């Protein structure tokens, strides 16, 4: 708070104002690598959020051996007590429900992708620290959900640790690497001459 003007907030000394001069952005810098990695993660979410529903609506819940809905074919057969191809033949309403369920997941993936791409492009590129940490935390926020899914499968005697590592491991690793590299790039950029952005 400003002593002369009660109720008026003053910008923090730690983080410059959004319109303050900043070092010029360079793609071939550490911050540029971080922005690129977060854009790739957003692009992957965007791609899957488009491709999965299209594939499921065109070819059904059992397309690609059911991997788009429940992972490895043997696993989903054990989890459901019957395979997705059997469900499509004997219970089309359940198959349609599973496709609709995947649609809801893909809707959230799309909104996350748009937000992640916008955050990387408009805020992280301008070296906003909050954007870096928000990008990391938003990627890590999915981990507890995948652990809960893994727990549910494990309760039914289905080993899915390897599948979960393949599913979420690369995105978590990329997000952590992007954050470390981006933080290093921001610290390094503090020594460069500032320009108006």
Residues of each region from the PLM?
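Topology signature of small-to-medium multi-pass alpha-helical membrane proteins
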Residues: 2, 8-197
């Amino acid at each position: 708070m400003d002593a002369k003007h009660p109720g008026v907030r003053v910008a923090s000394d730690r983080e410059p104002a959004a319109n303050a001069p900043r070092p010029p952005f360079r793609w071939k810098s550490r911050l540029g690598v971080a922005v690129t990695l977060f854009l790739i993660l957003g692009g992957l979410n965007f791609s899957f959020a488009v491709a999965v529903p299209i594939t499921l609506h065109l070819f059904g819940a059992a397309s690609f051996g059911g991997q788009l809905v429940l992972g490895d074919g043997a696993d989903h057969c054990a989890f459901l007590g019957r395979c997705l191809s059997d469900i499509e033949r004997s219970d089309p309403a359940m198959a349609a429900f599973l496709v609709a369920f995947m649609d809801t997941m893909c809707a959230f993936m799309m909104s996350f992708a748009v937000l992640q791409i916008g955050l990387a492009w408009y805020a992280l590129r301008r070296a906003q620290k909050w954007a870096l940490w928000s990008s990391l935390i938003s990627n890590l926020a999915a981990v507890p959900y995948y652990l809960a899914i893994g727990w549910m499968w494990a309760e039914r005697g289905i080993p899915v640790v390897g599948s979960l590592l393949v599913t979420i491991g690369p995105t978590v690793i990329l997000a952590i690497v992007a954050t470390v590299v981006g933080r290093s790039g921001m610290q390094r950029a503090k020594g460069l001459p500032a320009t108006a952005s």
